[in-house]
Amino acid sequence: MALDQSFVGRSYPPTDPYEVGREKIREFAEAVGDPNPVYTDPEAAKALGYADVIAPPTFVFAITFKAAGQVVQDPQLGLDYSRVVHGDQKFAYTRPVRAGDRLTVTSTIESIKSLAGNDVVDVRGEVHDEAGEHVVTAITKLVARAAEEG
């Protein structure tokens, strides 16, 4: 059953602050196989004009996808989580994520489409630091696969 289009534009409360730590950045860079020293060496980061190490571009996926869970778990929307897969991801940065940042995410349903019986929901996650400054916008595409005919 197609999702209700009236949910387009609905925003959810900001998440609790997520504190970005050097160790989390290092672990993420290691996990994705990116040896760039700007992610692990404060001196390398400072040489490029950053106050501390910065995170790889996809690092924020962990917090924006978790925040998109507010949409998935909204009982009024009626999205069947057991059928949801991640379809696509885009990021638009104002500045890099840095060690020491305390980030919040505000999720908004950007669009709802029905394609071949699948529900496709785009969720915009606006990421801000503790001072309220914009850091990155993440667009997460969620696909709820059509129910199998029995």
Swiss-Prot record:
GO terms for biological process: fatty acid biosynthetic process. Pfam families: FAS1_DH_region (PF13452). The lineage of its organism: Bacteria, Bacillati, Actinomycetota, Actinomycetes, Kitasatosporales. SUPFAM superfamilies: Thioesterase/thiol ester dehydrase-isomerase. Gene3D superfamilies: Hotdog Thioesterase (3.10.129.10). Belongs to the UPF0336 family. It comes from Streptomyces avermitilis (strain ATCC 31267 / DSM 46492 / JCM 5070 / NBRC 14893 / NCIMB 12804 / NRRL 8165 / MA-4680). InterPro entries: FAS1-like_DH_region (IPR039569), HadA-like (IPR016709), HotDog_dom_sf (IPR029069), UPF0336/Enoyl-CoA_hydratase (IPR050965). This is UPF0336 protein SAV_4901. It comes from the Bacteria. GO terms for molecular function: (3R)-hydroxyacyl-[acyl-carrier-protein] dehydratase activity.
